[in-house]
């Protein structure tokens, strides 16, 4: 069976195509566009004029996914659409554009689906933490093995933080203000004596490639994160983008995302970050295999 998942996030729109082989997911293709809905929603409370470019981006990633063929297409929207005054209308228009229902999932369900994807590869027996750092929110889960113990959704997302606090490139005093604001929210994170922290989301999955495109590491130390921060801050985003091979808007978001990940490591008393390329899309597909059309509830 071949499945596809689309998620409309606060920074990005992704499509994933995967085969189901002996109950496991094997990735076939992955596509992404960056319509950045979260920044618009944070500023105005609605998606408004950003709806058309976002739906164009959605159509683009689904069209690329269709070239591989699939049996089922699942779609969800997260924080930006959840928060927007016109989110329900946007979700209906998005669903019409791609021919399937776009479910606006709750913050709890987003955390559960992200965890399902991450735990399929990274779960350990003892207590561990997952951080899904998105463009508009961060889901934090404390778990044992593949069982969620506690979770919370925090209003600290890389795209919104970057647009709120940073110029291009960020100044030291801007980073200090952003850290202070993010730390206020992080005090609501669930407590835990965790032995590992696993990060997923756009910042986390792209950071290894900022270090090196040849054998990007699956684990990053605090020193690695600080090296990435220095590389992303050394010039304007458009110039940095050419050297690291990422879009300029991604560079801008990652500048704030790194700061959030450093704060999370410090919060849990760790110095090493595990990187997961699995997340909400893999969780959507695994939930579909378990629960069929109720995967999003």
Where do the language-model regions lie?
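N-terminal amphipathic/basic leader segments beginning at the initiator methionine
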Residues: 2-16, 25
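Conserved beta-strand/loop subsegment of P-loop NTPase cores
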Residues: 71-75
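Broad gene-expression machinery/nucleic-acid interaction feature
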Residues: 3, 12, 30, 128, ...
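Helical "lid/coupling" subdomains associated with nucleotide-phosphate turnover
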Residues: 1-3, 17-20, 40-68, 78-127, ...
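Short glycine/serine/threonine-rich phosphate/pyrophosphate-binding segments
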Residues: 13-14, 37, 112-115, 133-139
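N-terminal glycine-rich anion-binding loops that anchor highly charged ligand groups
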Residues: 24-35, 68
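A short acidic Gly-Thr/Ser loop motif
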Residues: 7-12, 131-137, 200-203, 279
């Amino acid at each position: 069976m071949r499945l596809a998942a689309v998620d409309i996030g606060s920074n990005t729109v992704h499509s994933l195509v995967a085969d189901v082989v002996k109950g496991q997911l094997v990735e076939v293709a992955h596509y992404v566009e960056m319509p950045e809905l979260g920044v618009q929603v944070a500023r105005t409370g609605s998606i408004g004029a950003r709806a058309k470019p976002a739906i164009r981006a959605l159509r683009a990633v689904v069209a690329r996914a269709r070239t591989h063929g699939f049996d089922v297409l699942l779609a969800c929207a997260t924080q930006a659409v959840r928060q927007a005054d016109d989110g329900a209308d946007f979700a209906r228009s998005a669903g019409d554009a791609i021919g399937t229902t776009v479910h606006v999932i709750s913050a709890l369900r987003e955390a559960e689906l992200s965890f399902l994807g991450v735990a399929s590869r990274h779960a350990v027996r003892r207590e561990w933490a997952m951080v899904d750092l998105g463009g508009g929110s961060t889901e934090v889960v404390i778990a044992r093995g593949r069982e969620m113990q506690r979770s919370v959704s925090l209003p600290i997302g890389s795209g919104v933080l970057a647009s709120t606090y940073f110029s291009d490139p960020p100044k030291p005093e801007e980073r200090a203000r952003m850290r202070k604001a993010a730390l206020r929210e992080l005090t609501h994170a669930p407590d835990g004596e965790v032995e590992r922290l696993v990060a997923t989301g756009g910042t986390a999955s792209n950071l290894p490639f900022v270090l090196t495109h040849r054998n990007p590491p699956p684990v990053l130390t605090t020193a690695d994160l600080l090296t990435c921060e220095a590389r992303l801050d050394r010039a304007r985003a458009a110039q940095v983008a050419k050297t690291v091979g990422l879009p300029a808007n991604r560079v801008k978001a990652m500048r704030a995302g790194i700061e959030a990940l450093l704060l999370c490591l410090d919060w849990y008393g760790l110095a090493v970050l595990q990187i997961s390329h699995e997340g909400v899309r893999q969780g959507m597909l695994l939930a579909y295999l378990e629960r069929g059309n109720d995967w999003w509830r």
